[in-house]
Each structure stands twice: as structure tokens, then as C-alpha cells.
């Protein structure tokens, strides 16, 4: 829990206690999604199942506060990473159409001080262009960045 601030832990505790109606120090795993949403997180059902499987130590359908804080820390890290990826994508997607064209990629690379040929730009696009449209969409961009 060292990556969480004291304020975050206190906020999580307040919310956790509201869901711990019997005062056992535990919540039912089925309540996790609702609890997380009250704290501004919006995990998908699949993400919830993965988070529960990772955090639940004794597989009894309940989470204690420490397990819950671990889940929240992980979810917040992933949310931060997602936001950073979207911001990076926007830098490349200069016209905001949701795609990085060869011209946009070339512009950014040159502004970063990279000397790249048209062939190198085309190769970079080809490596990540899974749908074959000649441009890089957000999902392809994330894949490309995660390969580096």
C-alpha cells in the first residue's frame, strides 16, 4: 500500500466501511465493482474478475481492506498508464482523426530530432498496421509502444 497516499487510504477506508455492513472487515467480491465506481474507477466485468482472482488470497468470495487497497492501487496505475498512452497518441495524431498517418508520424519524428527516411516511416507504419489501412489507430499504437 506504499504507493497510495494517506488521503487515498482514508478515502478507501471510508467507502469500504460503508459496504462492510456487518462490520467484519470484509466485503463480498460481488460488491467490488459498485465500491470501485463510488471511488471514480470504472472497471469492466472482465477486469473485475481478473482483479478479484489476483487479490483474493483465500478464494472465499470476500475481500479484506488490504486486498481491496491492492486492487485499487493496481487499477489506478493502469488508469494512469491508459491516460498517458492517450496523451502520447494525441501528440502523434495531429489532426485528431483517431489515426496516425505517415505524414503525422514523419512530422513528430523530425521534431524529436530523428532523421528518418520515407522508407523507414513506411516500415514503422507497416509493422503496426494490423488492419492494413496505411495508418495507425490507437490500439495499434498501444501495441507498437508496448513492443519497444
Curated annotation (Swiss-Prot):
GO biological processes: actin filament-based movement; microtubule cytoskeleton organization
GO annotation, cellular component aspect: cytoplasm; investment cone; myosin VI complex; nucleus
Annotated Ca(2+) 1 binding sites: 20, 24, 26, 31
Binding positions for Ca(2+) 3 per the UniProt entry: 93, 95, 97, 104
UniProt key word Endoplasmic reticulum: no
This protein's UniProt keywords: Calcium, Metal-binding, Repeat
Domain EF-hand per the UniProt entry, residue ranges: 7-42, 43-78, 80-115, 116-148
Signal sequence, start to end: none
UniProt: Ca(2+) 4 binding residues: 129, 131, 133, 135, 140
Binding locations of Ca(2+) 2: 58, 60, 62, 67
One Pfam family named in its UniProt record: EF-hand_7
GO molecular function annotations of the record: calcium ion binding; enzyme regulator activity; myosin VI head/neck binding
PANTHER family: CALMODULIN LIKE 3, MYOSIN LIGHT CHAIN 1, 3
Biological role: May be involved in calcium-mediated signal transduction.
Similarity annotation: Belongs to the calmodulin family.
Protein name in the entry: Calmodulin-related protein 97A
Gene: Acam
Amino acid at each position: 500500500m506504499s504507493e497510495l497516499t494517506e488521503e487515498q487510504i482514508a478515502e478507501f477506508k471510508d467507502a469500504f466501511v460503508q459496504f462492510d455492513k456487518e462490520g467484519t472487515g470484509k466485503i463480498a467480491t460481488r460488491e467490488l465493482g459498485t465500491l470501485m465506481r463510488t471511488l471514480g474507477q470504472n472497471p469492466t466485468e472482465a477486469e473485475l474478475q481478473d482483479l478479484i482472482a489476483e487479490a483474493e488470497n483465500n478464494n472465499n468470495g470476500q475481500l479484506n481492506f488490504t486486498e481491496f487497497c491492492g486492487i485499487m492501487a493496481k487499477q489506478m496505475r493502469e488508469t494512469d498508464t491508459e491516460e498517458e498512452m492517450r496523451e502520447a497518441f494525441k501528440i502523434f495524431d495531429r489532426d485528431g482523426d483517431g489515426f496516425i498517418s505517415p505524414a503525422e508520424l514523419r512530422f513528430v519524428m523530425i521534431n524529436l530530432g530523428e532523421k528518418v527516411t520515407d522508407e523507414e516511416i513506411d516500415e514503422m507504419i507497416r509493422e503496426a498496421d494490423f488492419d492494413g489501412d496505411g495508418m495507425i489507430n490507437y490500439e495499434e499504437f498501444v501495441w507498437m509502444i508496448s513492443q519497444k
